[in-house]
């Protein structure tokens, strides 16, 4: 008989079996469920070496999969981030900001990176730059709000060297006062690159702290019920060097979230070069059950990025997008690499689908099982799209619902 490693008893255990949706106890051996039932039934399998956990009536669910997460990049920075989700007021948020600033050693910054909206606060507003500067006058602060804006305190502006001569980047705006000096407010108009690139200039943690940070991030995901995720890559997440920390944790058997990861093109104009290099270095499926290479994406070419800043008009993708994307998708198809791509608006998605169909029609390369949908089905999808988006863009959709009904 298989040695039982773990028994959970006296609980409310969700099985997802329609015939038997809830049980009291579960027995696990070698990472597999071998028995469910009443506590008395399952405890008959216990051995002197079995770990037995009394749930005392608590709920247990199967592990959740997050199909779109930036877990590898996020783990490298998690210990440096101040989280505002669930914070009830601007006053509380500023108090936490001050505490974090007082405990942040130079040259590190205080970073609030998403996960919140002004409508969660009792005041129903954003913190002001004056309030942020008062809470943290000396430690650099970066506060990201959705993919629409970021606030920098005066200390961060000084470290970055932002002044009246600093130009606005393409698709972004540095808000200025009457003297032309930056106020600290950055706007995506609609490109979020101004936000990403600014945050990317903040100091990184030493490698040993990145390891610790990634472990803490995975532990937090576990607390929320997440046991597996598809990593969508990310800007500034270079392969293979920025995967060293997660590979170290995998080699040391310290991963607590299963990860399938995608490779994200990094530099505009060099995306095809990235994929030509990577397709010679690795292949989808490389790895094991815990850590596996998954394919390309979510960025295949920067010219296809339509962002999701709903404060701004929908951007028109440049005419060169189709040619750039077609060359990349054709290469991926020839190499049998699955891919994913980030897209927000149906106008963009239609153009992307046209590229995929064109690649699929070529005799020398074919996308396996490529199916496209007639406009009738696309219109049906558009009617329920907000329900789909809520899965991976909850805070943004919630914000839209509250703000715009």
Region roles according to the model:
Residues 325-328, 339, 348-352, 367-373, ...:
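Extended, hydrophobic alpha-helical segments in both membrane/secreted and soluble proteins
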Residues 3-9, 14, 18-63, 67-277, ...:
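Divalent metal-binding segments
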